[in-house]
Amino acid sequence: MNKLLILFLLLNAALTRQDNHASANNKPMLYNINSAPLYFEKFITQYNKQYKSEDEKKYRYNIFRHNIESINQKNSRNDSAVYKINRFADMPKNEIVIRHTGLASGELGLNFCETIVVDGPAQRQRPVSFDWRSMNKITSVKDQGMCGACWRFASLGALESQYAIKYDRLIDLSEQQLVDCDFVDMGCDGGLIHTAYEQIMKMGGVEQEFDYSYKAERQPCALKPHKFATGVRNCYRYVILNEERLEDLLRYVGPIAIAVDAVDLTDYYGGIVSFCENNGLNHAVLLVGYGVENNVPYWIIKNSWGSDYGEDGYVRVRRGVNSCGMINELASSAQVV
């Protein structure tokens, strides 16, 4: 066997052992920046990355190197969150926001949804932890791909849970229907959670995923009303002012689609994120539960970046500190017919 190939395989095995060490412990070993070229080649193979030219490859490598330096800084913090190289590692943060989030800014829609202010005293006797997944009311994690339509995954995720709560059955609803047939929101270029519900009300219902499958791009509307699986009876937009009251709302209403700033979450791998700033809301996700680990309270959030992201597609953020700007007026949920 070629000596260079043997050397590469040995180095790759060493890097793999380092990655395994990272996942086996609470805090990972820091990436060796001098090994960035090897990390990058492994990354290209693992995620089947293809670049149009050597210039683009160099450009992506420089971003990749910067991102692993940032990951090292995050992993040096005094919290339990772990960050690792993932499929976004060759992308600058603004590109990730453009391609893989999709929450619109400003007011859209007809505002059919009732507005509820989430504030005031919380219930005195509250369970320490709560998770809708344990009751089989959450559908599987999905992947929005390179389409800025997080708003539809979050809104339909909440609607799927409402259907499961009411009918004790999980169904996957069609995100593609909203991409193609919601003409108020902007398909793969952004939208709002509550306007998705308003548009489902206007359409008359929503089909199941297998009847109107996801393409991750806008196509001509092919609505089939006879295939509607359910619809929206009422929708609600929440002005969240109090996280303890949000706990009560989550337990009594069901999973809630919320808006966050996802920039600090792009390279998340596991643990509880304690440092997540809000420099502008850009992503919609589904709030499904909460808990406490090592005296640190946290929220459980379902993302739409596939099951290989984070903790099987989920992320935990610290509760009670407005993590990622989640205390805002863009949260929403709906009742199914």
Swiss-Prot record:
PROSITE patterns attached to this UniProt entry: THIOL_PROTEASE_ASN, THIOL_PROTEASE_CYS, THIOL_PROTEASE_HIS
Active-site feature positions: 150, 283, 303
UniProt-listed Pfam families: Inhibitor_I29 (PF08246), Peptidase_C1 (PF00112)
PTM comment: Synthesized as an inactive proenzyme and activated by proteolytic removal of the inhibitory propeptide.
Annotated disulfide bonds: 147-188, 181-221, 276-324
Signal peptide feature range: 1-16
Propeptide residue intervals: 17-126
Keywords: Disulfide bond, Hydrolase, Protease, Signal, Thiol protease, Zymogen
EC number: 3.4.22.50
Domain of life: Viruses
InterPro entries, per the entry: Papain-like_cys_pep_sf, Pept_asp_AS, Pept_cys_AS, Pept_his_AS, Peptidase_C1A, Peptidase_C1A_C, Peptidase_C1A_papain-like, Prot_inhib_I29
Gene Ontology biological-process entries: proteolysis
Reaction(s) catalysed (UniProt annotation): Endopeptidase of broad specificity, hydrolyzing substrates of both cathepsin L and cathepsin B
Alphabetized GO MF terms: cysteine-type peptidase activity
Family per similarity comment: Belongs to the peptidase C1 family.
Role summary: Cysteine protease that plays an essential role in host liquefaction to facilitate horizontal transmission of the virus. May participate in the degradation of foreign protein expressed by the baculovirus system.
Name of protein: Viral cathepsin
